[in-house]
């Protein structure tokens, strides 16, 4: 059973929007709704998303996550094959929670001021952007599908998952039933 008081606490929270630094080329992390550093420090690898040329494949079952395959994945549509400033984002009809750039041609001051980059063949998704990237290459909607699954770099990481338990029988975000 979730406590209704939790939503009251959430409503009173200070969202701490913004950044400590005025430039993306200097130190300082963004915090939004108590999500620490949603972009600008490292590229975040998004597992469960594979690209094969212009096609997007998504997987909702963590046990089936794999790279360079469509097995266990759903075709979520197509994306732009061009690099550039994002002009349009598409929503998948087969996975309505999935969105990805479908058109580039914007600028740093128009449409969505973040970039999309894509390579050909099998690719994986990084989002956000790393510290030290140019100011145009970091942002909440910055999509990078230029890298293969074998790529490794110190500016690529993943977000840890933290959740709290409230009451018996609460399910974790991955679906496991957890007894109190």
Spans of features found by a protein language model:
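C-terminal, surface-exposed recognition/capping segments
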Residues: 14-15, 22-25, 38-51, 69-180
């Amino acid at each position: 059973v979730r406590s209704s008081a939790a939503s009251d606490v959430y409503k009173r929270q200070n969202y701490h929007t913004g950044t400590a630094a005025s430039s993306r080329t200097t130190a300082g992390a963004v915090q939004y709704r108590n999500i620490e550093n949603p972009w600008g420090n490292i590229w975040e690898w998004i597992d469960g998303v594979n690209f094969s040329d212009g096609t997007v494949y998504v997987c909702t079952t963590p046990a089936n996550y794999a790279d360079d395959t469509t097995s266990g994945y759903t075709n979520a549509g197509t994306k732009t094959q061009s690099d550039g400033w994002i002009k349009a984002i598409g929503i998948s009809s087969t996975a309505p929670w999935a969105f990805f750039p479908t058109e580039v041609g914007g600028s740093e001051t128009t449409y969505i001021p973040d970039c999309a980059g894509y390579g050909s063949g099998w690719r994986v998704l990084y989002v956000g952007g790393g510290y030290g990237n140019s100011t145009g290459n970091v942002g909440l909607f910055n999509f990078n599908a230029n890298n293969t699954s074998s790529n490794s770099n110190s500016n690529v990481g993943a977000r840890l998952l933290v959740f709290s338990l409230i009451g018996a029988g609460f399910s974790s975000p991955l679906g496991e039933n957890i007894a109190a």
